[in-house]
Amino acid sequence: DGVKLCDVPSGTWSGHCGSSSKCSQQCKDREHFAYGGACHYQFPSVKCFCKRQC
């Protein structure tokens, strides 16, 4: 069975998220999320979310 991942808002990203690769790298480097992250829309803007095991 695969690992179930949940998105949590990045604690270090500020403002609009325009690059999922940069978001993912920041999640790994600054917040120590092994699975990285991605940009997702959450009203009212696109934000960086990091992925972790649920």
UniProtKB/Swiss-Prot annotation:
One of its GO terms (cellular component) is extracellular region. Keywords: Antimicrobial, Disulfide bond, Fungicide, Plant defense, Secreted. InterPro entries: Defensin_plant (IPR008176), Scorpion_toxin-like (IPR003614), Scorpion_toxin-like_sf (IPR036574). It comes from the Eukaryota. Gene3D superfamilies: Knottin, scorpion toxin-like. Pfam families: Gamma-thionin. GO terms for biological process: defense response to fungus; killing of cells of another organism. It is found in: Secreted. Disulfide bonds join C6-C54, C17-C39, C23-C48, C27-C50. Possesses antifungal activity insensitive to inorganic cations. Causes germ tubes and hyphae to swell and form multiple hyphal buds. Binds to the plasma membrane of the fungus. Has no inhibitory effect on insect gut alpha-amylase. Belongs to the DEFL family. This is Defensin-like protein 1. It comes from Heuchera sanguinea. The lineage of its organism: Eukaryota, Viridiplantae, Streptophyta, Embryophyta, Tracheophyta.
